[in-house]
Design a protein with these regions (language model features):
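Acidic/histidine-rich alpha-helical segments that form the ligand environment
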Residues: 83-125, 137-152, 156
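Short, contiguous alpha-helical
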Residues: 3, 7-10, 14-29, 33-84, ...
């Protein structure tokens, strides 16, 4: 948990993102390969697919933070890659996507730490939201959006995990962090 502290803006945003990434990572703890691929809800999302998608997203964000955001429109190839990022291919395993997630996470957090929230940037087109042109932003907008996105993904992972076996992701995070039992939590 990101506990209350007096951090700089960028450190605070980084820690909120990292907290959500810990939840996403913990969501697979104790699952078999088959369970990690199951889609127990009405959507096609699985825990392993959520981890793969998050790693894909982190790689894109890291490139955007380091190299500037691409203002190019989304191509059919880009869209196909995006959709493929939600499902494990037959030749992929949960361990594969966890390794990709861990590598992407380290790079992602380093890119956030090196960013200037007040810096000038450009948000790429987002046609799914009716935005077809690049828009000027401060990097802060993009960093806060990362908190939003990672929290959404952590929430999805939590719901999927609860449907699989009743475990809540916050309890899994605390278990992995070695939090001792208390009146509100038991590992």
């Amino acid at each position: 948990m990101y506990e209350p502290s007096r951090d700089s803006e960028v450190v605070g945003l980084l820690r909120y993102v990292d907290q959500q990434l810990s939840a996403i990572r913990a969501s697979v703890h104790g699952l078999t390969e088959q369970q990690a691929r199951e889609t127990p809800c009405r959507s096609a999302l699985s825990i392993a697919g959520m981890i793969k998608h998050t790693a894909q997203g982190m790689r894109g964000v890291t490139a955007n933070l380091r190299d500037g955001m691409a203002a190019d429109p989304l191509t059919e190839h880009d869209f196909a890659q995006y959709l493929a990022g939600f499902v494990l291919a037959d030749d992929e395993s949960t361990l594969d996507v966890l390794a990709q997630f861990d590598t992407a996470r380290a790079d992602h957090l380093a890119a956030i730490a090196a960013s200037d929230p007040a810096g000038e940037n450009v948000a790429p087109p987002a046609p799914w939201q009716g935005i077809y042109d690049a828009r000027p932003i401060h990097t802060r907008y993009y960093l806060v959006h990362q908190v939003e996105e990672m929290a959404r993904h952590a929430g999805h992972a939590d719901i999927i995990r609860e449907q699989l076996d009743g475990c809540s992701v916050p309890a899994l995070v605390m278990t992995l962090e070695g939090v001792p039992a208390n009146p509100f939590f038991e590992p």
